[in-house]
A protein has these predicted regions:
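Short beta-strand/loop segment at the start of cytosolic alpha/beta domains
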Residues: 1-7, 19
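Amphipathic alpha-helical interaction surfaces in cytosolic regulatory modules
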Residues: 15-88
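Conserved beta-strand segments of the P-loop GTPase G domain that flank and frequently precede/overlap
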Residues: 6-8, 36-37
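Short acidic-hydrophobic, aromatic-tinged amphipathic segments that line or gate anion-handling sites
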Residues: 89-93
Length: 103
């Protein structure tokens, strides 16, 4: 499986969602699954959540994956409250993610 790591900025919101979505979709178009490094992202808006969900759906339609790694407490709270955490494979570390991918 071809995989690329994409590192999110400190926020994913209405100001940067289009760029993030375009970059994730470009990775998927290359035939790669995406590991989304969220270790510095401390805020995600509803627009940002839609980007994640849309990217996950596109990945699935292509037989690829979207993995979330290193979610901060702030973003984890938002994802738990909205129920979005149930839609994604979420890992604490890159090592955990790599082990899951390898199996």
């Amino acid at each position: 499986m071809n995989i690329e790591i994409y590192k999110l900025a400190e926020e994913l919101d209405s100001f940067n969602y289009q760029q993030v979505q375009d970059e994730i979709l470009a990775i998927l178009e290359k035939g790669c699954s995406v590991v989304l490094d969220m270790t510095v992202c401390h805020y995600i808006s509803s627009t940002g959540l839609r980007v994640l969900l849309y990217s996950k759906k596109v990945a699935a339609s292509k037989g690829q994956e979207l993995y979330l790694v290193g979610i901060t407490d702030e973003v984890n709270d938002i994802m738990n409250v909205t129920g979005f955490n149930s839609f994604f494979d979420i890992f604490s570390t890159m090592e955990e993610c790599q082990k899951a991918i390898d199996h």
